[in-house]
Design a protein with these regions (language model features):
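Post-signal peptide N-terminal segment of mature Sec-exported envelope proteins
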Residues: 26-48
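Soluble periplasmic/extracytoplasmic beta-strand elements of cell-envelope proteins
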Residues: 37-42, 109-115, 129-133, 145
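Sec-dependent N-terminal signal peptides
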Residues: 4-14
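Mid-length scaffold segments of soluble, non-membrane domains
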Residues: 102-117, 122-125
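Short glycine/proline-enriched turns and hinge-like loops at secondary-structure junctions
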Residues: 51-53, 122-127
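C-terminal/domain-edge helix-coil "capping" segments
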Residues: 17-34, 136-223
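Solvent-exposed loop/turn segments at secondary-structure junctions
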Residues: 45-48, 77-81, 115-120, 150-152
Length: 223
């Protein structure tokens, strides 16, 4: 019996190892094209929260910079996008992107699709569902694509007992309501883009090919 258990465990371990895929295998185009500069496109908002587009737009700049890329500031490009009717990114997500290469000099354009945004004050959760798509402005190829359903945990522990529970519920509700949408959006972006190959200005540039890539769709809770 023990032999069967050990054999089963070994089989599970081997299958899990076999399923793990490297970043160069998951995102080969990233390593082929080696984009240096990224233009952040205005988010495509599929939720009923009209303001989600504007506040999420500002969350993308810092995480991409931290991954080692030169990113055109949304504040600088917003006026250009609006004048070129590019503020509605839906019309560009599958279209030719050469104009962004010619005008801005961007090697790639990052598209985001906000699919859900929910706030649970008593439960202490902010949930964001976002898909990230990085496309080459040169070839039009998709270089990177990943989607996440991320819960930002804003719960507060007020101690034990009935009184402590009531304090926790009240503090959690206040903390969740007060949590800035930009902060929650940034945490979502940082988590989902965690397996994105690093750019030229990253510390692991050219050295992360064999690191494990994440699943194309990820669910997680972050603090």
């Amino acid at each position: 019996m023990k032999k069967y258990i050990i054999l089963s465990l070994m089989t599970l371990l081997m299958s899990s190892c076999a399923e793990q895929i490297t970043r160069i295998a998951q995102y080969p185009k990233m390593y082929e094209e080696k984009p240096l500069t990224i233009a952040v496109m205005p988010p495509i908002n599929q939720t009923q929260h009209v303001e989600a587009k504007d506040y999420f737009y500002t969350t993308l700049y810092a995480p991409l910079c931290e991954k080692g890329y030169y990113v055109y500031s949304p504040m600088m490009t917003m006026e250009m996008f609006q004048s070129e009717s590019a503020y509605d990114a839906e019309q560009f997500i599958e279209a030719d992107l050469s104009q962004f290469r010619n005008v801005l000099g961007a090697d790639a354009a990052m598209f985001t699709i906000i699919k859900s945004w929910k706030r649970n004050n008593l439960g202490g959760k902010l949930t964001a569902g976002v898909e990230y798509i990085l496309r080459s402005t040169k070839t039009g190829e998709t270089l990177y694509r990943r989607e996440g359903l991320i819960k930002v945990d804003t719960s507060v522990n007020g101690g034990g007992g009935i009184f402590g529970t009531l304090v926790s519920l009240a503090a959690t509700a206040i903390n969740t309501a007060a949590t800035d949408k930009v902060v929650a959006g940034r945490k979502c972006t940082v988590f989902v883009l965690s397996d994105m190959p690093e750019g030229k200005y990253g510390t692991k540039y050219g050295q992360d090919q064999k690191l494990p890539a994440g699943k194309s769709y990820v669910k997680a809770t972050v603090k």
